């Protein structure tokens, strides 16, 4: 998605050869116009998948998931990284390691909001080693639903996340695929659509 790649070039920063900072428009401050375009792009890419619901992970996945759900006219639900007093009963759970935060979270989702037999689109902000996306697919399947696809806003293609998802049979659509991170330069995988 050219608009997203341009935004990453303009406002993203490679903090190392592994870490891309996009807090100016995605995971701290959010650009609503860009999120709207992202929602439209995901809706277009998955228009034939008959999606019933979107599942994402708090917090950076919420904006792109909500805009996609709005565009597709379907509900979305986000998995929580920590249990609260109101999120206690009938949960599906998975452990997810965050490379960026260097910690493991036990993510959870209420079975009330992902129903058996539903076709679910998993959306996440980043794909690196695939931990978050795989954790979300585990939640969806534990609830008895089917993962119809995985939508990623920014993929670090030099890491193994895509391969792990594809090996498990998931369709992966990434809007921007980063090939390499270097100081003052971010390069992208050229994708022919």
From Swiss-Prot:
Pfam families, sorted: Pribosyltran
Keyword Cytoplasm found: yes
GO molecular function annotations of the record: xanthine phosphoribosyltransferase activity
Major subcellular site: cytoplasm
Binding site for xanthine: 20, 27, 156
BP GO annotations: purine ribonucleoside salvage; xanthine metabolic process; XMP salvage
One GO cellular component term noted in the UniProt record for this chain: cytoplasm
UniProt pathway annotation: Purine metabolism; XMP biosynthesis via salvage pathway; XMP from xanthine: step 1/1
E.C. designation(s): 2.4.2.22
Regions annotated as coiled coil: none
CDD domains given in the database record: PRTases_typeI (cd06223)
Keyword Transport annotated: no
Superkingdom of source: Bacteria
Subcellular localization, as worded in the UniProt entry: Cytoplasm
Residues that coordinate or bind 5-phospho-alpha-D-ribose 1-diphosphate: 128-132
Keywords: Cytoplasm, Glycosyltransferase, Purine salvage, Transferase
Enzyme class per UniProt: transferase
HAMAP family: XPRTase
Main function: Converts the preformed base xanthine, a product of nucleic acid breakdown, to xanthosine 5'-monophosphate (XMP), so it can be reused for RNA or DNA synthesis.
Description of how the protein assembles with itself and partners: Homodimer.
Family (UniProt): Belongs to the purine/pyrimidine phosphoribosyltransferase family. Xpt subfamily.
Protein name (record): Xanthine phosphoribosyltransferase
Native source species: Exiguobacterium sp. (strain ATCC BAA-1283 / AT1b)
Name of the gene this protein is made from: xpt
């Amino acid at each position: 998605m050219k608009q997203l790649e341009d935004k990453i070039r303009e406002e993203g920063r490679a903090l190392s050869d592994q870490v891309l900072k996009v807090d100016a428009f995605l995971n701290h401050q959010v650009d609503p116009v860009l999120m709207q375009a992202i929602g439209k792009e995901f809706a277009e890419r998955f228009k034939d998948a008959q999606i019933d619901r979107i599942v994402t992970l708090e917090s950076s996945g919420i904006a792109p998931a909500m805009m996609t759900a709005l565009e597709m006219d379907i509900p979305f639900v986000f998995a929580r990284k920590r249990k609260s007093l109101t999120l206690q009963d009938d949960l599906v759970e998975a452990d997810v390691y965050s490379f960026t935060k260097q910690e493991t979270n036990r993510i959870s989702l209420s079975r009330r909001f992902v129903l058996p037999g539903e076709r679910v689109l998993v959306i996440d902000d980043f794909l690196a080693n695939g931990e978050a996306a795989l954790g979300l697919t585990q939640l969806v399947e534990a609830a008895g639903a089917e993962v119809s696809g995985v939508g990623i806003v920014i993929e670090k293609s030099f890491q193994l996340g895509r391969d792990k998802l594809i090996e498990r049979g998931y369709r992966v659509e990434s809007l921007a695929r980063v090939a390499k991170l270097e100081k003052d330069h971010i390069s992208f995988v050229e994708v022919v659509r």
